[in-house]
Amino acid sequence: PQRFGAEPNVGQCLARTEKTVVSLTTIAADEAAQRLLWPAEHAQGFSAVIDARSEGEYALDCLPGALNWPSLNNEERILVGTLYKQKGAFEAQKIGAALVAANVSRHIQAHVLGLGKSWKPLVYCWRGGKRSGSLAHVLSQIGFQVTLMEGGYKAFRKALLASLPQRVAPISWRVICGPTGSGKTRLLHALRDVGAQVLDLEGLAHHRSSVLGLIPGQSQPSQKKFDTLIWDALGRFDPQGPVFVESESRKVGNVSIPEALMTAMRASACIRVETATELRVELLMQDYPFFVQDSDFFCTRLQTLVDLRGREVVQAWCEAAQSGRSREVVRQLLEQHYDPGYAQSTQRNYSRFADAQVLQLDDIGASALRRLAQGLLSGLPPSA
């Protein structure tokens, strides 16, 4: 008989409880990247992607759809790094282990207790080291089927850059061209609304591409994040159908379009949108209301044109905007800044622009754009 208060031995515990099957496998980053598109129901799909890096690292970029469960947060990561430099690896790892254990416990309490055994996470950190390894180990000990990505985010980034040209290659692009304010972005969104495949680069970049394209209250993603967003979108397209994209220069604000994509776009069939100047002015007044409503912000953005247009011209535009004549400023921006050289520049950069299908846009309303998009998608002669 067991003495009162004595601890049961391991054998007795196992006899009384269901045996936990520990499943922790590793996977190369390039294979993980391919499997990200597979549904969770797939035998090799993932129920969730868990990023064990700090919130600061996660914000710069992460795997598509990843959740952030930091093993060390920003401050803790700095603390452990400082200890490593000042007192050596052993002292740093003791503190790091305590912090990681506490954080993993919090993540389990917050996110894991309600999950069933079928949950299959992919876990990664910066280089596939202790941060992801610790979290993955505990989750696997619970009984989940855990996959640990070798090499972490660093290896994923390398795999992404290597595979991005392969994702671009099979796609048949349709490039929507037209001067500023012609309705390219509205047409792109209308195409998306009627079921077309669309790559909205300006939407991904949180920028409207032109010198004045900064959107108030929205920060642009990092270059790495922008690349990942594009890479993920490319992987979801059906190469059997066309993908519509707006003509762009190499940079959209502060981020650059990947070279393979830029090259493919510039060699693809073009659609040229033609819109009367007055209609373009009206469209810009509608789509850039923050310039009309905040003349000080408008003037701040106009200062970026001083080197190109001269201080006197920019000052005159600012005075007009501040006196309520924003429409006049918009018209002059089109005529003096955006339009000169547009066709020549586009023809030089987009080799098939001269043979572009021409769309005359006489109505910038949603229903007219929808009809235009439906006609374009169906292959019928589109008309607004």
Task: Give the positions of each predicted feature.
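Conserved nucleotide-sensing/catalytic segment adjacent to the nucleotide-binding pocket
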Residues: A196-T263
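Glycine-rich phosphate-binding P-loop
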Residues: R131, R174-R192
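Conserved NTP phosphate-binding and transfer environment spanning the P-loop NTPase/kinase superfamily
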Residues: T263-C270, E274-A384
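A conserved segment at the C-terminal end of the G1
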Residues: A136-V138, R186-Q197
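Positively charged, proline/Ser/Thr-rich regional signature most characteristic
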Residues: E41-G116
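Catalytic cysteine-centered active loop of the rhodanese-like fold, especially the PTP/DSP P-loop
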Residues: I95-E150
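Flexible, polar/low-complexity N-terminal or interdomain linker segments that lie immediately upstream
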Residues: R3-G5, N9-P64, A92, L161-V168, ...
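A short glycine-rich beta-strand->turn/loop micro-motif centered on a GG-aromatic cluster
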Residues: L122, F144-K158, D200-A205
